Design a protein with these regions (language model features):
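Active-site nucleotide-donor binding segment shared across nucleotidyl transfer reactions
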Residues: 1-24
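Short, surface-exposed helix-loop/turn micro-motifs enriched in polar/charged residues
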Residues: 7, 149-150
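Conserved NTP/Mg2+-binding pocket subregion across the NTase superfamily
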Residues: 34-142
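Charged/polar positions within long, soluble alpha-helices
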Residues: 136, 143, 162-170
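Short helix-adjacent coil turns
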Residues: 142-149
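Small-residue-rich helix-loop
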Residues: 154-159
């Protein structure tokens, strides 16, 4: 539903910008969108948010070298998927390309498809362990009748289950 209603508070257009090196300062990026209002930049997380023609946009600047390292070695840095799960890989693989200056995205997708089964097994094992952790948290939340902890634990369980499904169906 929110995908069709621009005024739904959950609706926004999310853009991943894969880049190399340092990103330009926020004022330079803001100047690239002259019609934008309410521009805010989160430099620590390399994200910009703004409204253009009443449509909310979120741009996240992603370092190509991080993905190159992951895709060429098949090894993820410790905690690489802890907060995002496999969502970043899903977006890399299935996101719609609106603009590209090189064939990097095409090559990255080929590299993602070529990752060996050991990589996917490692991810599956890690995410299944997290699912078990969240399942234990759910049990504790039910036993203590803690609605907030139940909500947090169930969201973690569902998100991790989605990561397991992505890994299985990669």
């Amino acid at each position: 539903e929110s995908g069709e209603d621009f005024y739904d508070p959950y609706f926004f257009i999310s853009v991943d910008c894969y880049c190399t090196g340092a990103i330009p300062p926020s004022h330079t990026r803001r100047d690239l969108f002259p019609g934008a209002v309410a521009f805010e930049s989160l430099h620590a997380s390399r994200k910009d948010r703004f409204l253009m023609r009443d449509i909310p946009f979120r741009i996240e600047y992603k370092d190509q070298s991080y993905f190159d390292s992951l895709l060429h070695t098949g090894e993820a840095p410790e905690g690489a998927f802890r907060d995002t799960g496999t969502y970043m890989l899903y977006r890399l693989r299935h996101g719609t390309v609106a603009f590209k200056r090189s064939d990097w995205i095409d090559e990255a997708r080929k590299d993602l498809d070529a990752l060996n089964q050991d990589f996917w097994n490692m991810l599956r094992t890690a995410f299944q362990a997290r699912m078990e952790h969240f399942l234990g948290d759910l049990h504790a939340a039910i036993a203590r009748e803690d609605e907030l902890f139940y909500l947090v634990s169930s969201s973690g369980f569902i998100r991790t289950a989605c990561s397991v499904l992505f890994v299985i169906n990669h």
